[in-house]
Structure formats: C-alpha cells, structure tokens
Design a protein with these regions (language model features):
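Basic, Lys/Arg- and aromatic-enriched nucleic-acid-binding interface segment
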Residues: 1-33, 40-41, 69, 77, ...
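Short, basic (Lys/Arg/His-rich) helix/loop patches that form interaction surfaces
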Residues: 3-14, 23, 72, 84-104, ...
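C-terminal secondary-structure termini that scaffold catalytic or DNA-interacting sites
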Residues: 42, 55-80, 84, 100, ...
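A general lysine-centric signal
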Residues: 49, 64-66, 148
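Short, small-residue-rich loop/turn micro-motifs
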Residues: 49-51, 78, 86, 154
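Catalytic-site neighborhood detector that most strongly recognizes the C-terminal catalytic loop/helix
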Residues: 51, 154-180
C-alpha cells in the first residue's frame, strides 16, 4: 500500500486514493463528494450521492440504497489531505474535480489511473478499483474494528451481509484467537496454581477464575 500511495502522490491523486483506502467508499460515491460534505472540525464525511454514467453522460444520482446514505468518520491525516486538495481549487465545490474539465471525474478514468498506479508500484495482482474497498474492509477487520461498525461505514444493509462477505478474514482471526487462548490455557494448567477466591456475587459478569500469567 505504501508504494501504491507513493505513486498516487506522484500522479497528483493522493487525496482521492488515500480517502478510498481509509473509508472504503464506492467509486461513484467517492467521485460525487463535494467540499460541503466534509465537516473538517468533526472529521465527518456525509455520503449522499454518487456519480454514474448514463447514456454516455455523467450524472449525479442518489446512492445505491437507503443504507448507502451515511456519515463516515475520517482520520486527521485524511482530513488534512482533503483540506490541502481543496486549497488548490477553492472556488470549485467538487472535492475531486477533474483537472481536464473541472467537473466530475469519469469512473472509467479513475479505474484507468488505478491500473497505472498498480503497474508503477510493481503490484502484479489484478486489483480493480472496487477491490480498494475490500482492502479497506480487510484492514479494518484485521485492526479489530467490529463488524457492525464496519457495516455502517461501508453502507451495507446489514452486519450479516458484511460478515458473509468477509467471513474468510474473520475465520482466520478466530483461528488466531483460538491459538492464543490455547496457549494461555496450557500455561495456566502447567502452572498448577491454587484457585483464587470466588469473586463477589455482585460482579457484573461471570467468568471462570484464572490467574494472569506473565
């Protein structure tokens, strides 16, 4: 990802592709963003429209589904990049205007840029622009973001759909967690220490008493 973003910076599209990898927006949603959609102070991005191509013309329409209308929290670094990008064209309401037309980017043009970035970064995998959305989701789950939160960020209609989509990731994480728990249980049983006293009845949750090892 580091090499990919370096190439995006060279190409002059770092803010756009950084935002994509840190928010997982759909391509049309990303291209339809306007400056007024960003709350700089709260670091919140409002997603409520998309760019599509209909009969050869670019058109701004409502999002894919009602769940696609959402607010997405951003990192400070992402906000800083967006502010810097806007300062280059302060009179244009579009967050990512096409340098050629000043209007919205064509979805196909952005996909072609993605291929160029991949090639220049030496990434041989066939990564479509939509796969950047999957990359974000994979990083989020691997970083410990719960599925319900991720689902709302992606604009999915249910957490169950998100879980089904990324079940291979959560399965790997579960196996990793099982190994950690197994190692912990082995160390506990090997220690053969006496059980600590029972916790008070008013405890909010009940667990099998254990002694912290290490």
């Amino acid at each position: 990802i580091g090499r990919y973003l370096q190439e995006a910076e060279k190409y002059g599209v770092l803010p756009m592709f950084y935002l994509e990898l840190s928010s997982g927006l759909r391509r049309g949603e990303l291209l339809a963003l306007q400056w007024e959609d960003l709350n700089v102070k709260e670091r919140i991005l409002t997603v409520n429209k998309q760019v599509t191509r209909m009969e050869g013309e670019l058109d701004v329409t409502e999002p894919k589904t009602k769940n696609s209308v959402r607010k997405v929290a951003l990192s400070q670094q992402a906000v800083d990049l967006l502010v810097q990008a806007h300062e280059q064209h302060p009179d244009n309401p579009i967050l990512f205007p096409s340098p050629r037309t000043g209007g919205y980017w064509s979805p196909d043009a952005v996909s072609r840029i993605n291929w160029k970035l991949l090639k220049n970064a030496g990434i041989e995998e066939h990564v479509r622009f939509h796969d950047l959305r999957h990359t974000f989701a994979t990083m989020a789950i691997s970083s410990g973001v719960d599925v319900k939160t991720l689902s709302s960020m992606l604009g999915h209609y249910s957490a169950g759909f998100t879980l089904d989509t990324y079940t291979h990731i959560t399965s790997d994480m579960q196996r990793g967690a099982a190994e950690k728990i197994g190692g912990f249980m082995e160390s506990v049983t090997a220690a053969n220490t006496p059980e600590p006293p029972d916790p008070p009845e008013e405890s909010r949750c009940k667990v099998i008493p254990f002694e912290k090892v290490g």
